[in-house]
Amino acid sequence: METLASLYNEHLSTLQQRTRDVLERHQLDALLIHSGELQRLFLDDRDYPFKVNPQFKAWVPVTEVPNCWLWVDGVNTPKLWFYSPVDYWHSVEPLPDSFWTKNIDVQPLLNADDIAQQLPVQRERVAYIGYAQQRAQALGFSAENINPQPVLDYLHYYRSYKTDYELACMREAQKTAVVGHRAAYEAFQSGMSEFDINLAYLMATGHRDTDVPYDNIVALNEHSAVLHYTILQHQPPAEIRSFLIDAGAEYNGYAADLTRTYTADRDSDFAALISDLNTEQLALIDTIKSGERYTDYHVQMHQRIAKLLRTHNLVTGISEEAMVEQGITCPFLPHGLGHPLGLQVHDTAGFMQDDKGTNLNAPSKYPYLRCTRVLQPRMVLTIEPGLYFIDSLLAPWRIGEFSKHFNWDRIDALKPYGGIRIEDNIVIHDKRVENMTRDLKLA
């Protein structure tokens, strides 16, 4: 088995090739990629938690250090100016010495402003990639060379195709997230509050709240009907009926994004609904293959939701086909099937059809779908169908010609459980689909 160092070396070669291509296409000499800067809280002397530029961590697994800079030209060894000030107020990261540093020219940067003296004087054909546009302007970059859209489009498009190094990192992130999910399930079983379940997850994964790739969703009972619920109640409800956890982890800057739903009563109707949605999710994954458009699988999932609505007597007197055609499945599954995953949880280029940035929007019927790409080998995506009981979405259906098909008594009986979401992370290969999540036996 190849070591992470050898995989990184191959990864770097791929990035160098992409850099040569994009520089040649846009008549540039180099890219200057900025890790980012600390952002000060308004009227305060503290900063927001630092979040690194994803284009920076694509090159080096440095995720917590601001004021770092990468100079890449696709030919010479990438040069990293690593921010290493003399500071007794804050901890300072030592110069890195790891599996990746033999391939990078690492130089200390004692003061953030010193970067101006380190760069070549002639920068007319250099593009700045980062979010500190005022800093780029101060360094003399013209507006057209600050995050030029054609360059970003190219870089974003090819980020969809993960290298072996990236896939190895994402599998490690999966392992960490699975450990956290198991700890959270045990906390739920013991009757803990949302707040304490979240602490159990963070403890098991070794993450802080600011380290996880997105805000953990830890929802008991009807809270799981809020798609991005992040309140974290400190006290458990008087009766615990259900538990939804949508939580991930990071490894070298790469994300995992997993969701599971559980019920306290394994013999309840809601438990049967969880089991059947799990079956349909796995069955859908079994049909996924390279060369097909992701949008088609989203539509297929709505057909499977219609099947569940019929078999669980939630919608009656209308065919499954008509349910999908009339949009009856939409209030039960209001979000997309999933999204690209990688350096970002909602990774780039979900709608991009080529490296020139050609966009294909989600269908108007399914506006929250986050990916319209044709699936190809090395893409990593989430598959996360849900089935929810959301008052605001169901309310319009209580009147009108289709109201008679909704079993409102049964729907209202399930509303206190909130909803279900089951999410796995998959890798597209030439002849198969790898389910990184299920490979780790997370049921």
UniProtKB/Swiss-Prot annotation:
GO biological process, one term: proteolysis
Pfam families: PepQ_N, Peptidase_M24
InterPro entries found in the cross-reference section: Creatin/AminoP/Spt16_N, Creatinase/aminopeptidase-like, PepQ_N, Pept_M24, Peptidase_M24B_aminopep-P_CS, X-Pro_dipept-like, X_Pro_dipept
Residues at which Mn(2+) 1 binds: D257, H339, E384, E423
Record bears the keyword Hydrolase: yes
Signal peptide start and end residues: none
This protein's UniProt keywords: Dipeptidase, Hydrolase, Manganese, Metal-binding, Metalloprotease, Protease
One of the record's GO molecular function terms: phosphoric triester hydrolase activity
The enzyme's E.C. designation: 3.4.13.9
Cofactor info, note text: Binds 2 manganese ions per subunit.
GO cellular component terms listed in the entry, alphabetical order: cytosol
CC cofactor: Mn(2+)
Catalytic activity, reaction form: Xaa-L-Pro dipeptide + H2O = an L-alpha-amino acid + L-proline
Binding of Mn(2+) 2, residues: D246, D257, E423
Function: Splits dipeptides with a prolyl residue in the C-terminal position.
Family named by the database record: Belongs to the peptidase M24B family. Bacterial-type prolidase subfamily.
Designated name of the protein: Xaa-Pro dipeptidase
Organism: Yersinia pestis
Biological classification of the source: Bacteria, Pseudomonadati, Pseudomonadota, Gammaproteobacteria, Enterobacterales
Originating gene: pepQ
